[in-house]
Each structure stands twice: as C-alpha cells, then as structure tokens.
C-alpha cells in the first residue's frame, strides 16, 4: 500500500492513483514489490525536527527516507519537505511538479538500495531519477496535453 499524508501542511496536487502505479512500476523494474510506503509531506521546520531527532543532523533537507524493506519488498516512511521542493524547483529551473516527482522517486530509489553518498553514486542516482521521470507522460507533470502514464521499461 502506498499512502500520501501531510504533517501540518497542505497536500500537494497529486493524482495518487497514477503516482502509485508509477512507483510500483519503478519498484518492479528494480526487482521489488511494494509493501507499505508512507509519503509524509511536511514543512522545512518539520523535516529539520525529524533530521535532528532521528539522524542527529542539524540541517534542512528535501527528503528523509526510513527504510523498512525486505530483500524482495520495498517499505518505508518517506518525509518530503514541500518548502525545499519548491526552492529546489526554482534553483534547478524545473517545474514544482517535476521536482516533486523527482523527490518522490528519489525516496523509492533509496528503498531499492540506491545510494548517493559519493559524487559517483549521486550522479548515478540522478540518472536513475531521470530515467524514472521519463516514464511519466509529460502532461502528467504539467508539460503537455495527454494525461496517461507511459509504461516503465528497462
């Protein structure tokens, strides 16, 4: 089950059914089924609080992923700061929707075991995000007229 909730912030405009289908397709491409994934959309202040409390880090971030996966099933809690998503969209000259989808899939990629701790693994993570984003019809991200998801192919 994939759930989308908020923590004292307005829910972003998402077609949860389509996004869930996309997440499942990407997970399957990495050899995983989907267990329970909870996406929690929050503010910068809340993600800073989570970062301090659970990770001992005293800085803002766009995403924190708590991984409860098994060898065959991805599960976890994924906190996403919508404030940072908005800032990053401006910084990287992307639409808010595209950046939000990038961060959503970034969390899933962590659940599949992908890392981004070195320049090399960070670059590989970006390539994998781009590949997953290319599977989403551009209209779904607000960039064209057709609103269907493309199949996700390896």
Where are the regions that the model predicts?
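Short active-site segment of divalent metal-dependent hydrolases/proteases
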Residues: 105, 109-113
